Amino acid sequence: MKRALVFFLLALPVFAQNKLTDTALTPACGPDDAKFAVKTAKSGRPAIQPDEGKALVIFVEDDSEFASHPKPTTRTGLDGNWIGATHGNSYFSFSVDPGEHHLCASWQTSIIVGQGHKTAAAHFTAEAGTVYYFRAKNTWARDVGTADISLKPLDSDEGQLLTSKFSLSTFHPKK
């Protein structure tokens, strides 16, 4: 009994330490407590013409391999600030200045099914006049049992195909 008590007292400081969240570990994400309200609506093809002197990024959330409900709401971070969110199979676009940028995709809330990654990151170097597609792919399969997210660049043809099938995401910060 004394041995167990001594072990518990010695181990207590380890359990009391603050764990860094996934979003704190990448320079792309914003504060972990930021939340968005998201609406999606089926629309036509997105405008894919960048503003003068800018690049255009189209962020796509793909839940086609997420076999559970509810689907995650995915926040998008750029260079340390949250800039928007998606839910379900949806997308939105934003302009960036030329140069190096860091992207983050992070689930707004924890997903109960499994303990996979809930944040993913990527970086790219934007050139003026160029359109970039990125896909946040959310996955969960009953036989694997772990939910996961990945963030990868997409070929422009695949990006246009997905945005023609998916809904446009609109969002605003929750208060």
Segments from the language model and where they lie:
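Sec-dependent signal peptide recognition
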Residues: 2-7
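Short loop/turn and low-complexity linker motifs enriched in small/turn-promoting residues
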Residues: 17-175
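Hydrophobic h-region of N-terminal signal peptides that target proteins for export
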Residues: 8-16
